[in-house]
Amino acid sequence: MSSSTWISIDFDDYRHLPKYSGHPTRSNKQHITSANKELSEDFLKGMTGLENWLNSNDYPVTFFIIADLFDNTTFSNWFQLIINQFPQRITIGNHGLNHRSWSAWPEDVEGFNDALVESNKILQQYCGDNLRPWFRAPAGYIAPWMAPVLAKNGFKVDSSVNPSWLVKRKAGKANTWSKVEQSMKDNKIVEISWKTKWSLPINGPALHIPILKTIANGTWKSSPVVDSLDNSLKINGQITALYWHLLDHSRKQSTWSPPLP
């Protein structure tokens, strides 16, 4: 069986993190819809760093974008420049309307559906032919009840599952990652879970956490060749999913780059 690596970048600013908004217990009191929509200094630096990185290689990459970022003119204008510069390399996935941690709250089919409809509408407007029916739950909070709603809204791929025991709570109360994966399968959605090592996370924040960082770097560098998800899905081979955050590109004075093979 052929194998490939799919790389993606989550477009989260600090205001989107569960620490600040969207989570019933982890967030401060600021309501998610009233959060300041201005881009943080590090996010702006990350935009510069990402552009530098894109100019340094020819990897195909997926951006998982939170739709409310397009409320910001600076981001919208920059995004259009990037898409115009790299139209064949970039695909876009849905990372939610405003980064609500859905599975941490009581089941809300109607609210989730409304958020998908609105976020899809916004992304279709700005992303055009680069948009794909791919979803990544904000902060990886995904529960089985969300799969039928994703299917109803035309999604074909989900990449929300981080199959590590350290974050199993994100599947929702009394749920497991296997239940999430089965629900996706039952609803004819391809689940592409994140790569782990020894059941430890190696994506996203793990790239910068002591010990996990060392494990992640070695695993990433030994991963299969990078290919677009469009191609990998056609081949129906084994897919290794690796991802990081746009904010990572603000590190090292906007010169940080992921430890890709």
Model-predicted regions and their roles:
Residues 1-83, 132, 249, 255-257:
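Active-site beta->alpha N-cap acidic-glycine motif
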Residues 40-44, 109-117, 219-223:
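Non-membrane alpha-helical structural segments and their capping/turn regions in soluble enzymes
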Residues 103, 169-174, 251-260:
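Histidine/acidic-residue-rich catalytic or RNA/ligand-binding cores of hydrolases
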Residues 237-261:
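Active-site and substrate-binding clefts of carbohydrate-active enzymes
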